Amino acid sequence: MNNQFTWLHIGLGSFHRAHQAWYLHRLIASGDNRWRIAAGNIRNDAEQVVQALAAQGGRYVLETVSPEGEREYEEITSIQKLLPWQAGLQPLINEGANPQTKVIAFTVTEGGYYLNTRHRLETSNPDLQADLQGECKTIYGTLARILEKRMADNAGPLTLLNCDNVRHNGERFHDGMVEFLQLTGKQAVIDWMAANTTCPNTMVDRITPRPAADLPARIKAQAGIDDKAPVMGETFIQWVVENNFRDVRPNLEAVGVEMVESVIPYEEAKIRILNASHSCIAWAGTLIGQQYIHESTLTDVIYAIADRYVTEDVIPCLGDNGIDLPTYRDVVLKRFTNPYIQDTNQRVAADGFSKIPAMIAPTLQECYQRGVRPEATAMLPALFFVFMEQWHKGTLPYQYQDGILDAQAVHEMFEAQDPVAVFARDKALFGDLANNADFLALMREKVAAVYTLIN
């Protein structure tokens, strides 16, 4: 019986290489060499990195740095097969359908799931429309081809593992995948998927900025390695995974992964406290002319906005969930002050149109359900509103990236007679609160407060 297994990762970015690949590397280094990573991308916008990694045999150096400036260097060797991008993604599809592949994991960002506030597919999205016609521009079109081939080849069961910052990420992906297959008339694949796959929920955490320009020189000086594709991240790392794998899995708990019955308490704390605060700080910092997360966090007025949001609204909403939330808040905000990873506001500010409904709107809604006006939380969408107003005017200091940005709709919003009303009444962002008169009044107050902050 073959006991060599492949973990296929789709989305070969810095985060995967600083997080999941690090854990698999530690597992291999411990003497468990049954697993290896094969990795590739759906898009061809990172082929330079893939080619550099291929030339290095998949090896690269990870630099980690603490808030105190302590740096460590580790050569990561778990990625042992690089899948070059081709139109049609045949190398990726073949690897996914290989019987040795037992886990397919993916990091395609929050916007890469194309889900609306009701967790249904945004079928009007051009990439999704292309995939519904048989192309492979999204995770759904790509995995549909893999699952179809795996079914035809009788390649056996496997686990589909979402590693993105999406609430209930395994379930959301599963439902989106099934809806996609329904829309393409692939009932046989749906049946096969139900019998042969699971989609565990996960929570991932390690701040991973874009590699600094001087990183290769630092690695050469400190580790003596010429590396054309290094990555960097903070020292802190966490991975919580629902123990619901369909077939064999790596012994992840041996290297510090928390295998649990339910990920929900961890993901709620992380998404609301870390992810939402991170974006809040990036939007606010940008608006007052700052470039980096650490300098934005260390600005008293911005720190206070994030701290109030968590303390006054998030912690009461989450209640006693088994996690020490005040301590978690303090640890998160301390991590954001790390000046050595040089994390940019540009990176963290991205994908706001996915983040508001996923990370911020639930706290707004739950505050109203508790009979509390969400004064502190409302500052977050107000910051994003003014941030996007600067985008509309062309005065942002960098290019804003958003996988589901409808540029025409945003320009029309700011050209309307009452832009704040258009924003607050957007069901895609705020769900049922779009019909709440007090929420509109609150947004007017907070947008005015943001103007005061930046002027």
Swiss-Prot record:
The keyword Oxidoreductase applies. NCBIfam families: DArabDhDalD. It comes from Klebsiella pneumoniae. It catalyses: D-arabinitol + NAD(+) = D-xylulose + NADH + H(+). It is an enzyme of class 1 (oxidoreductase). It holds the Pfam family Mannitol_dh_C. Disulfide bonds: none annotated. It comes from the Bacteria. GO terms for biological process: arabitol metabolic process; D-glucuronate catabolic process. The keyword Nucleus does not apply. Monomer. Keywords: NAD, Oxidoreductase. Pathway: Carbohydrate metabolism; D-arabinitol metabolism. This is D-arabinitol 4-dehydrogenase. Its EC number is 1.1.1.11. Gene3D superfamilies: N-(1-d-carboxylethyl)-l-norvaline Dehydrogenase, domain 2, NAD(P)-binding Rossmann-like Domain. Belongs to the mannitol dehydrogenase family. The gene is dalD. GO terms for molecular function: D-arabinitol 4-dehydrogenase activity; fructuronate reductase activity.
